[in-house]
Amino acid sequence: MSKSGKKLTQKLKKNLPVTGPQAPTLYELMQWYCLNTNTHGCRRIVVSKGRLRRWIWISLTLCAVAVIFWQCALLLMSYYSVSASITVTFQKLVYPAVTICNLNPYSYSKVKDRLAALEKETSQTLKNIYGFTEPLIRSKRDVGVNVENSTEDIFLKQIPLYRLESVKGSQLVVSDLKTKKRTRMSAKVIHRDAESVQDPGNMVGFKLCDPKNSSDCTIFTFSSGVNAIQEWYRLHYTNILAKISMEDKIAMGYKADELIVTCFFDGLSCDARNFTLFHHPLYGNCYTFNSAERGNLLVSSMGGAEYGLKVVLYIDEDEYNPYLSTAAGAKILVHDQDEYPFIEYLGTELETATETSIGMQLTESAKLSDPYSDCTMDGRDVSVENLYNKKYTLQICLNSCFQREMVRSCGCAHYDQPLPNGAKYCNYEEYPSWIYCYFKVYKQFVQEELGCQSACRESCSFKEWTLTRSLAKWPSLNSEEWMLRVLSWELGEKLNKNLTKNDLANLNIFYQDLNSRSISESPTYNIVTLLSNFGGQLGLWMSCSMICVLEIIEVFFIDSFWVVLRQRWRNWWENRKENQAEDTPEIPVPTMTGHDNPLCVDNPICLGEEDPPTFNSALQLPQSQDSHVPRTPPPKYNTLRIQSAFQLETIDSDEDVERL
């Protein structure tokens, strides 16, 4: 083909009409898209010559589209899997708060007047069960309290003690530990120490009944009489303390200068003024070092045993309650300054006559909240009210939820948890059935029937101290004599006694190093990463950009919709016109003329046969109803032919150009 022919062909193709979105059919729309798209595969399908090449490009394009859908599905699954990555960093930190408690909550000499009747019944019960004599029980101290002789045991009457002798189905054979009377009864048995009873004759427990329904009773059994007596004593002890004011309980506890004998921090001397009072319902007066209530937080200058907190504690074992505290020593807890010290759950015990060295390592954790986890940032989105007025923790939420259910079900609050607004602590005088109700609510709480475990969530950010403990005998044999003499002389005015090593406990708590471990979560996939990966997959498999994606949306969704809609509208309109033409009746042409013509009845211009109409009057005459448009097809001229814009016909000669 000559150069002039090629130029003419290009000019004709350029000037041919391109319909695009206005294409009458989907086929022409797809053909226009494939010729004009930036996606190479679709264009090669149209312009390739030969059926084999065309099918190859169709297969490759479809495979690329399938791979894109597969990879994008994997990306979406990764995005909605809400996985998180963990970052570990190390940084320096301040010294934590350290709470110290004596295992004996109250000095016995200060509380014995309130517990005299309970102690009398307890010792008498032990004598009835095991044959203990009075001097054996009180060999280490003299109670020194005159208790009025009374034949009525009020504590055993409120909570009677039994020995479980045999179990036959639902029938129990028990013997009263006071009267030795055997009784057969029907009651539920709850084993506090074991799930099954191997030897019922060794089981000791107490019976609780619902005052409103005397037949509804439960016997709580223990595998050892020691545990049964302690639990029975603790219930009455709690009932007595619930009626004592906070001021009196603080006065009955240990003072800071009585508990803290010596103190050193970071190589410098400290004293009781560096400790803050914290009254615990179970451990009495506890003291917190570095609580941040007295000013700035303390910081360790270096890591190691020489730069931590060193204290010598006075345990005063002679003032221990024998039925309440069976272990002698102290209990400590390392915690953050704004956290409540749950020392009964997380505390570490210290032995007497022992030096306890504790190395600390802090780990700070920060989790992602919803949708990555079910944690809460500050507890405001938790339905349970915080009764502790401290930073939210899971344990605070669980205890607050239990106390709320206790008040709702029993009408009073348990002594171990803070008192809600408008509630009172449980006691026998005002709430006779509170113990039975307490065990019933506690059983529901343990079995997760109260909904507390589902309502409470973990905190997203928290601090955790890993403790490494080591023990050493203290003081040594060579230093015991002079050290105890010096300490006895310094505390002589307060103690009026010579100290022994069993009265003291030594604590050394320090950072192993000044680095802390920080664990934080970050989303593995976010919206930016998702879009970036989508773009990478489209560009890798189809050389497609965001503009190409918009083209696909425009052509395959918007333009295709309008093309189909126009086709349906055109078909409907043509069918409607054909139906109207078929339903229209043919009106015959009237043969009458002049005044006899019914068309001229109301027309004043109608003329007779003898009067030919003028030009103006003829224009005003009504038209004939049976006039038809001629349906003769137009002549076929070669000059009226129009070639399709998408016809890729080649022009090989000037004759073809002239023919076009």
UniProtKB/Swiss-Prot annotation:
Membrane topology recorded in Swiss-Prot or TrEMBL: Multi-pass membrane protein
Disulfide cross-links: 101-286, 209-217, 263-270, 375-460, 397-456, 401-452, 410-437, 412-426
Record field: catalytic activity: Na(+)(in) = Na(+)(out)
Topological region Extracellular: 77-537
Recorded GO MF terms: ligand-gated sodium channel activity
Entry-linked NCBIfam families: ENaC (TIGR00859)
Protein family according to the UniProt entry: Belongs to the amiloride-sensitive sodium channel (TC 1.A.6) family. SCNN1G subfamily.
Protein name: Epithelial sodium channel subunit gamma
UniProt source species: Xenopus laevis (African clawed frog)
Gene symbol of the encoding locus: scnn1g-a
